[in-house]
């Protein structure tokens, strides 16, 4: 089984594909888009790239980080648009989608739901035996995938 993890964002959209059986990194990247590009065109780019990755790697399941609504409500709405793109791609390819909160993800990887980004990234490197540098957005996406794999393993 392969899982694609998604760390949604309209400017930095992380995704990572993991082989659940071998707990091995298949592919990960960050879609980096300029703030100068209007939102509809950033979303279009995310859609096209994510769709091509899903078509290329055929993940069995998708795991997406839930939205945390903070002080900037507008940012949460924009984040919601990026999540909607991931959901659309999943629906088009009939891939089941699972959602996890930031706290759930951190707890699954570090044992502590309020862990710092550096700790989460370090655990992603350890779980997947990564020897190359990856962005925080990639690490977060891979963390969502690992969280999902762990949740399925613990309940099977």
Curated annotation (Swiss-Prot):
UniProt-annotated binding residues for Mg(2+) 2: 65
Membrane-crossing residue ranges in chain numbering: none
Cofactor binding comment, as recorded: Binds 2 Mg(2+) ion per subunit.
Residue numbers binding Mg(2+) 1: 7, 137
Record localization: Cytoplasm
Signal peptide: none
Cofactors demanded by this protein: Mg(2+)
InterPro entries (UniProt xref): RNaseH-like_sf, RNaseH_sf, X-over_junc_endoDNase_Mg_BS, X-over_junc_endoDNase_RuvC
Major localization listed first in the record, in broad terms: cytoplasm
Enzyme kind, highest EC tier: hydrolase
EC number(s) reported in the record: 3.1.21.10
Reaction catalysis annotation: Endonucleolytic cleavage at a junction such as a reciprocal single-stranded crossover between two homologous DNA duplexes (Holliday junction)
Active site location: 7, 65, 137
GO molecular function, one term: magnesium ion binding
Key words of the record: Cytoplasm, DNA damage, DNA recombination, DNA repair, DNA-binding, Endonuclease, Hydrolase, Magnesium, Metal-binding, Nuclease
GO biological process, one term: DNA recombination
Cellular-component GO terms for this entry: cytoplasm; Holliday junction resolvase complex
Role description: The RuvA-RuvB-RuvC complex processes Holliday junction (HJ) DNA during genetic recombination and DNA repair. Endonuclease that resolves HJ intermediates. Cleaves cruciform DNA by making single-stranded nicks across the HJ at symmetrical positions within the homologous arms, yielding a 5'-phosphate and a 3'-hydroxyl group; requires a central core of homology in the junction. The consensus cleavage sequence is 5'-(A/T)TT(C/G)-3'. Cleavage occurs on the 3'-side of the TT dinucleotide at the point of strand exchange.
Name of the featured protein: Crossover junction endodeoxyribonuclease RuvC
């Amino acid at each position: 089984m392969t899982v694609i993890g998604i760390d949604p964002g309209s400017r930095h959209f992380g995704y990572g594909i993991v082989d659940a059986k071998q707990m091995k990194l298949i592919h990960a990247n960050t879609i980096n888009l300029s703030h100068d590009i209007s939102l509809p065109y950033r979303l279009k780019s995310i859609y096209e790239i994510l769709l091509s990755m899903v078509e290329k790697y055929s993940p069995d399941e998708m795991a997406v980080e839930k939205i945390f609504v903070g002080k900037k409500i507008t940012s949460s709405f924009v984040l919601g648009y990026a999540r909607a793109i991931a959901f659309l791609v999943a629906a088009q390819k009939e891939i089941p989608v699972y959602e996890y909160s930031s706290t759930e993800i951190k707890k699954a990887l570090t044992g502590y739901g309020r862990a710092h980004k550096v700790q989460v990234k370090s655990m992603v490197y350890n779980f997947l035996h990564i020897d190359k540098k990856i962005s925080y957005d990639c690490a977060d996406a891979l963390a969502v995938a690992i969280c999902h794999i762990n949740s399925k393993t613990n309940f099977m």
